[in-house]
Amino acid sequence: MNVPIINHPDYVAQIGDDHRFPIKKFGELIKLLKLKNIAGNDNIFKPMEVSIPTLLNTHTEDYVSKINNLSLSSDEIRKLGFPLVESVRRRSFVATGGTVLASKLAVKNKLACNTAGGSHHAFSD
């Protein structure tokens, strides 16, 4: 079996073309993996959003609620480094769900890759 590749179209959040973070790289990566026949219908897995209870293993209830309800303060948004819009919230939850799925598939298959890796902008609170 080919290495499981976890990917979701929502990994490319709508943060604006002028944002310094190259968010489009996540869409380009899956295109390249397909072009090189590394990823295909048989080994691409689409994650679901991570559950709130899973998030609460690491983050405070207040922080998760603020992210989920798009209600961070302007200082908290600045610290996060991304605009707080639904596509960013969705991407965060789906990417984390992708990490959970990759972990489960790696246990079963010895290896798995989440194409949303490298987005370390979360805080416990």
Where on the chain are the PLM-derived regions?
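HDAC/HDAC-like amidohydrolase catalytic core signature
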Residues: 1-125
